[in-house]
């Protein structure tokens, strides 16, 4: 006897809800090049793909940058053709998707390296003063120079002092390998072994490069290694990069939470929990450290006419972070009508790398 399919009458299909996975790595690197066709973009994933797409005969400069990038472990690179450094506008940079954090530009054969450096530096300065650029949409621009005398402090501007074309792509390659969801992947860029030529500098010139917050490769412990590790404003490169990624992953996690239609105090507990869980990943990755104390004055914030203390002077960040969620009572009726959550403040103790060891002692 033939069986009748019961789905004709009652069709049930219960599935587990699958939350979209959030990646701990980003497709972070954009490389503009004056070579090629304006408007053409290619996401390149390997040196083999780079060499087949950008042959040295047609793209003699672009391939140099890509070789340096992939020879130093770069993960992916989005190449945007037909734009030189002088053609890139602030709007071009701001229009890039948030995941693209690192931006470089190929030197035109007719350009002086100082001109390219100056153009990218101007872009970085302009971006740093743009109030619409913060948190998840910040970019770090990478450039190369052969002049060590620039003392200007510039936010989110990473500089490699080198005579080798494309050497700044070692910075991009290093950052592209960081995975904030894996253990101990966030480390100081200084002393990283790299596959480029070492610079032959006097001790005085080397000191000037570091004093001006540039990066330079030298031979150290029988290998070519980057020294420096800072952005042009003196902030640590790795920490600045991971802070941007933290903004992005936290935003993604909290957005996923919002679509679940959370409400009231239980919703605030969920928000707190999501933030804490995310920060624990960053602690495991090495970005957050446990040995810092808030030595500044009390951090007070004002909201709707009331003052709240986020963290007091002398507080040890024993977990590596402090999360302060203002109470429901801080909300006005207008806030409640707009379905706002109270403001949330996060204080994070980021790691720092030890770059110099000084030992003082006496022989007795």
Task: State where each predicted segment sits.
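Alpha-helix capping and helix-coil boundary motifs
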Residues: 84-89, 150-153, 202, 304-309
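Structured, hydrophobic secondary-structure cores that serve as assembly/anchoring elements
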Residues: 1-55, 223-364
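Short small/polar-residue motifs
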Residues: 139, 203-204, 211, 320-322
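Small-residue-rich
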Residues: 1-143, 223-224, 228-229
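General structural signal for secondary-structure boundaries
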Residues: 45-51, 61, 85, 109-112, ...
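Extended basic-aromatic, gly/pro-enriched interface segments that bind polyanionic ligands
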Residues: 2-16, 21-24, 54-59, 64-68, ...
């Amino acid at each position: 006897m033939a069986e009748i399919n019961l789905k004709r009458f009652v069709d049930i299909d219960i599935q587990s809800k699958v939350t979209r996975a959030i990646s701990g790595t980003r497709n972070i690197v954009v490389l503009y090049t004056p070579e090629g066709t304006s408007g053409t973009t290619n996401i390149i994933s390997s040196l083999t793909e780079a060499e087949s797409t950008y042959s040295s005969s047609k793209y003699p400069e672009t391939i140099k940058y890509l070789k340096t990038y992939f020879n130093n472990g770069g993960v992916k690179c989005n190449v945007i053709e037909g734009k030189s450094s002088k053609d890139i506008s602030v709007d071009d940079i701001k229009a890039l998707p948030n995941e693209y954090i690192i931006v470089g530009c190929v030197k035109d054969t007719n350009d002086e390296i100082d001109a390219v450096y100056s153009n990218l530096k101007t872009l970085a300065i302009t971006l740093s003063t743009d109030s619409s650029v913060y948190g998840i949409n910040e970019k770090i621009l990478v450039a190369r120079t052969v002049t060590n005398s620039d003392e200007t402090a510039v936010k989110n501007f990473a500089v490699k002092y080198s005579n080798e074309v494309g050497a700044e792509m070692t910075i991009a390659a290093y950052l592209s390998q960081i995975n904030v969801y894996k253990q101990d992947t966030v480390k100081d860029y200084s002393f990283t072994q790299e596959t480029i030529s070492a610079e032959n500098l006097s001790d005085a010139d080397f000191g000037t490069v570091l004093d001006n917050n540039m990066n330079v490769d030298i031979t150290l412990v029988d290998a070519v290694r980057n020294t420096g590790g800072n952005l042009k404003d003196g902030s640590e490169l790795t920490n600045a990069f991971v802070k941007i990624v933290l903004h992005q992953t936290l935003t993604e996690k909290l957005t996923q939470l919002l679509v679940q239609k959370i409400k009231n105090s239980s919703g605030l507990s969920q928000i707190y929990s999501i933030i804490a869980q995310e920060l624990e990943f960053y602690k495991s990755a090495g970005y957050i450290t446990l040995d810092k104390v808030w030595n500044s004055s009390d951090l007070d914030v004002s909201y709707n006419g009331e003052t709240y203390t986020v963290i007091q002077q002398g507080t040890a960040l024993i977990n590596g972070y402090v999360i302060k969620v203002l109470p429901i009572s801080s909300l006005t009726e207008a806030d409640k009508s707009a379905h706002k959550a109270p403001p949330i403040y996060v204080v994070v103790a980021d790691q720092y790398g030890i770059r110099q060891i000084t030992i003082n002692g006496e022989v007795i």
